[in-house]
UniProtKB/Swiss-Prot annotation:
Residues 41-174 are annotated as: Necessary for interaction with EIF4E. The keyword ATP-binding does not apply. Residues 13-41, 181-205 form a coiled coil. One of its GO terms (biological process) is regulation of translation. Residues 144-156 have a biased composition (Acidic residues). The keyword Acetylation applies. The gene is NGDN. Residues 124-169, 277-315 are annotated as: Disordered. This is Neuroguidin.
């Protein structure tokens, strides 16, 4: 009775699956027939195909054959225990899973080849359109000059005169090769959120909370501001370079101003009540603090009509 109840409960779902299977088999059969006719007519050349795709198609076909055999035995009331088709299905499935990473690596190249074979040309946004060409690295003017020199040589040979060779030519730098830029606004926003999360995870608040609730032993270190630590590392690197190369590196005005501002920031007391922005971790709106905004210099505008001051000559 229990088996009869299970059979009655599974009967509607089994009928639905059989109907879906019949529809899918009919659709696949029609697609295969149309492809076979096109291949036989010569619409799709197959003499130079990919062996990887051929092996994959053969494995999928064998998998479907064994699966159909199992469905037939199951519908006839047979047992699947120790069935040879089950072992073959497991083996083919393992091979297909091993081929999946290779399929992901070849997906772009295969799609590009298929699209090129169907349309006859590459896409406008294809990155391979912007690859460097050796012909673009050569100056067009130099080739024209060479042609003119050859024409002059021919004329001089005809008239009995010798042309002067080895004249220096003007150097023309090669043009820059265009690069496709396909970054969207969503990708830029994602990168900005990732930078905000990294900045929040490296803040002093998160570090202190981690040390408070962690079971690891406390690490005692010199608590300094990150920009002070970075500045000391740069100074040490500069000192090591000067001592090893026996040279004195010059410091620009911009570097001096940056060090001066860093010293002022480290000496101010407003940082005692300042907490880093961790809204990227809590799901809030990420915003920049006043200290994170870049400092812009005022552009000096020259005043017209004013002469430079000079030394007055004494009489």
């Amino acid at each position: 009775m229990a088996a009869l109840g299970v059979l009655e409960s599974d009967l509607p779902s089994a009928v639905t699956l059989l109907k879906n299977l019949q529809e899918q088999v009919m659709a696949v059969t029609a697609q295969v027939k149309s492809l076979t006719q096109k291949v036989q007519a010569g619409a799709y050349p197959t003499e130079k195909g990919l062996s990887f795709l051929e092996v994959k198609d053969q494995l999928l076909l064998m998998y479907l054959m064994d699966l159909t055999h199992l469905i037939l035995d199951k519908a006839s009331g047979g047992s699947l225990q120790g069935h040879d088709a089950v072992l073959r299905l497991v083996e083919i499935r393992t091979v297909l899973e091993k081929l999946r990473p290779l399929d992901q690596k070849l997906k772009y190249q295969i799609d590009k080849l298929i699209k090129t074979a169907v349309t006859g040309s590459l896409s406008e946004n294809d990155p391979l359109r912007f690859k460097p060409h050796p012909s673009n690295m050569m100056s067009k003017l130099s080739s024209e000059d060479e042609e003119e020199d050859e024409a002059e040589d021919d004329q001089s040979e005809a008239s009995g005169k010798k042309s002067v060779k080895g004249v220096s030519k003007k150097y023309v730098p090669p043009r820059l090769v265009p690069v496709h830029y396909d970054e969207t606004e969503a990708e830029r926003e994602k990168k900005r959120l990732e930078r905000a999360k990294r900045r929040a995870l490296s803040s002093s608040v998160i570090r202190e909370l981690k040390e408070q609730y962690s079971d690891a032993p406390e690490e005692i270190r010199d608590a300094r501001h990150p920009h002070v630590t970075r500045q000391s590392q740069e100074d040490q690197h500069r000192i090591n370079y000067e001592e090893s190369m026996m040279v004195r590196l010059s410091v620009s005005k911009r570097e001096k101003g940056r060090r001066k501002r860093a010293n002022v920031m480290s000496s101010q007391l407003h940082s005692l009540t300042h907490f880093s922005d961790i809204s990227a971790l809590t799901g809030g709106t990420v915003h920049l603090d006043e200290d994170q905004n870049p400092i812009k210099k005022r552009k000096k505008i020259p005043q017209k009509g004013r002469k430079k001051k000079g030394f007055r000559r004494r009489r």
